[in-house]
């Protein structure tokens, strides 16, 4: 389990915050025509990476490890169904992701002058983006774990794509500096839309002009994250296995 691996816990909670501080400290210039620094934009977007880290990466690794050591095979001997197993895993991830979000929000507010939502609508948006992002990334983590033979191989197939997606999704660098083909690739995956949703409530309203569509596109964020959640669940139910023997 995640909480039984201290090194994994430490890496999960520290890495997004450390990367946020480093990148935010490097990119300090304000965006043209605004008073908001590039560091603030990165800090707001980094919440998406935090969720990806606690859900997709850690579930992919921990489930592959449990399968490799026989933990899932033993669990199969209980009344637990695959669906209830998924629900339990996502609930655990939600708690960890919430703690990660609190840490990143604290860094953003204290170091990069982010402002928490000032109205119920902003908090509502922050909440549903968080929930849908957690669910979609968790299900993708469960799905990808089926293609890893152990924790080591799972670390490779989860961390590799995750790092690449940060660059094309506007978390490590602002979207305004990315070429069109990178924007197209990033728009396929959940991380880009999660980051956009978080920026919409943590940055000043006028920052919307720096989004590719010139709009926060809340409706599209909802549709994309919901689609990935539904697709992820279907994929998990189709390929999930309790042991390496099937």
Language-model segments: residues:
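Short helix-capping/hinge motifs at transmembrane helix termini and TM-loop junctions
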Residues: 23-32, 108-120, 148-149, 173-178, ...
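Residue-level signature of transmembrane alpha-helical entry/exit and packing/kink sites
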Residues: 8, 12, 16, 37-46, ...
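Transmembrane helix boundary and interhelical loop/hinge segments in multi-pass membrane proteins
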Residues: 2, 6, 55-80, 90
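Alpha-helical transmembrane segments of multi-pass membrane transporters/translocases
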Residues: 200-246
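Short amphipathic alpha-helical coupling elements at transmembrane boundaries
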Residues: 1, 73-77, 149, 183, ...
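Short hydrophobic, aromatic-rich alpha-helical segments embedded in or entering the lipid bilayer
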Residues: 173-211, 219
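Hydrophobic alpha-helical transmembrane segments of multi-pass membrane transport/permease proteins
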Residues: 3-30, 39-58, 98-100, 160-166, ...
